[in-house]
Amino acid sequence: MIPFTNFESRLIKLPINNVDTDQIIPARFLKTTSKVGLDKQLFNDWRQDPDFVLNRPESQGLQILLAGDNFGCGSSREHAPWALTQWGFRAVISTSFADIFKQNSLKNSLLPIEVPADVHAELFSSDGPAKIDLPNQTLTTPSGREVHFEVDQFSKHCLVKGVDELGYILEQAPEIAAYEASHPAPINALA
């Protein structure tokens, strides 16, 4: 995983509510366990339209997806955040996310940011870049408005350090070894 740094990017706007995981990446592309190449299947059915937002040259290299309400609903599939991160997205902004999509995203270096409806509307009506500061949990809108967002401390730590759950445990190896050395295993008298 790549450490999550503060960044600034214009927004790719997808003003569609209730985008489910099958629309993010259709089920026919879920046979792989590799993340490589999933960006080509991201929003595959919609990308058949040459005017779809991801097909526009000005969308290339942008790192923030501004999505409609209830983004990532539907079935649990880790391929959805994989495809989004393979495209280059570091964050998705919406008023709400499906819980399982939110958890899958946090475990795969994609920051889901929930904002109030008024901020959401402001972002859809603005054109400049937004700034994301994960350590301070702030989103700065193109107009300069600073908005606090929530993220649990464990996920925040993992994103900032660029580690997954196993990486986090491995970071604690010296402390675990010290604890085990100072607490000998009990003798099993029944053996």
Curated annotation (Swiss-Prot):
Function recorded in the entry: Catalyzes the isomerization between 2-isopropylmalate and 3-isopropylmalate, via the formation of 2-isopropylmaleate.
Pathway terms, separated by semicolons: Amino-acid biosynthesis; L-leucine biosynthesis; L-leucine from 3-methyl-2-oxobutanoate: step 2/4
Coiled coil: none
Catalytic activity: (2R,3S)-3-isopropylmalate = (2S)-2-isopropylmalate
InterPro entries recorded: 3-IsopropMal_deHydase_ssu, Aconitase/3IPM_dehydase_swvl, AconitaseA/IPMdHydase_ssu_swvl, IPMI_Swivel, LeuD
One Pfam match: Aconitase_C
Subunit note: Heterodimer of LeuC and LeuD.
Domain of life of the source: Bacteria
Keyword tags: Amino-acid biosynthesis, Branched-chain amino acid biosynthesis, Leucine biosynthesis, Lyase
Entry's family note: Belongs to the LeuD family. LeuD type 1 subfamily.
UniProt-recorded Gene Ontology molecular function terms: 3-isopropylmalate dehydratase activity
PANTHER family: 3-ISOPROPYLMALATE DEHYDRATASE SMALL SUBUNIT, 3-ISOPROPYLMALATE DEHYDRATASE SMALL SUBUNIT 2-RELATED-RELATED
HAMAP family registered for this protein in UniProt: LeuD_type1
Gene Ontology biological-process entries: L-leucine biosynthetic process
EC number: 4.2.1.33
A GO CC term assigned to this protein in UniProt: 3-isopropylmalate dehydratase complex
Protein name: 3-isopropylmalate dehydratase small subunit
Class of the enzyme per the UniProt entry, highest EC level: lyase
Disulphide-bonded residues: none
